[in-house]
Amino acid sequence: MRTINPAVRPEIGAALPSGIELSAWPSRIGAFPATPVEMAMQAIGHLEAGLSAAEAGAHAAVIDSVADYGIDALRAALAIPVVGSGEAGLTAAAGHGRFAIITVWPKSMNFVPEQLLRQHGLEAQCLGIHNVAEEGVLDAIAGPDGYLNRINRADRSVFDKVLAAVNRAIEEGAQAIMLGCTCMSGMAAKIAANTSIPVINPLWEAAKMAVALAHSSDSTGIKTDRADLVRRMVNAVAGEVDENCPVCVAADEFD
């Protein structure tokens, strides 16, 4: 039986083998990671979310962000496999040769993919980061007509710009495209159907890797004695701000 938590993207759950239950464990720190300051805050939020997922019985955890918030801390704290979408996506993209990153966010947020490329030694293999948004989108993220909802439903105002960026990257010699945000997961198949080179959905790559690692691991739970302290830290700021960023740890469990 496959059970999909409504908060987990259906395109991911539907493609996984039967017998897998996906659940979402959102970061309780609601700050949108527009700068390295909020990114550091999300590392703590994701650590706490991962601890909760592991304690609830998850067999693996996926960081639902290419920023891979708190990945080192999560791996140190959890006894279960932890996979970052950024790490998994880059690995898959690099396997095809020279690649480009297409992101729905403005240039001011390129510190996220740039840091990821440095960490994994792939700066030279990446032909470039293509941004399809202007800075003003950061002022209109929330709401029914907000930017995130337009991304999630692959609105033409976003999708057409993404596809144009993909075509520019191909003209520059890209042999694969990595989507620069897991929020683009819902449009990944549509993009792939309209282009001639592989389109890497980092969230899907991470989910596949997590399932494989969980099947080969018997470990469960956590391995840190700091879980309560982490929760007290998050409790102090939880609910203080809600900037409509659905960042979370997606956990895999097995029936």
Language model segments and positions:
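A short, Lys/Arg-enriched amphipathic alpha-helix followed by its capping loop at the start of a domain
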Residues: A7-I20
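Short, acidic/small-residue loops that bind anionic groups at enzyme active sites
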Residues: R75-H96, A192-A210
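A C-terminal functional module that forms or caps the active site or interfaces directly
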Residues: N167, Q175-M178, T182-N194, V199-I200
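Periplasmic-binding protein-like
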Residues: E55-S65, A174-T182
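Short, glycine-/small-residue-rich phosphate/pyrophosphate-handling segment
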Residues: R2-T3, A94-E134, I141, A212-D255
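Active-site rim beta-loop-alpha module in soluble metabolic enzymes
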Residues: L117-G180
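N-terminal beta-loop-helix "entrance" segment that forms/cooperates
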Residues: E21-E48, L138-P144
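Glycine-rich, highly charged phosphate/nucleotide-binding loops
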Residues: P36-S52, A154-A164
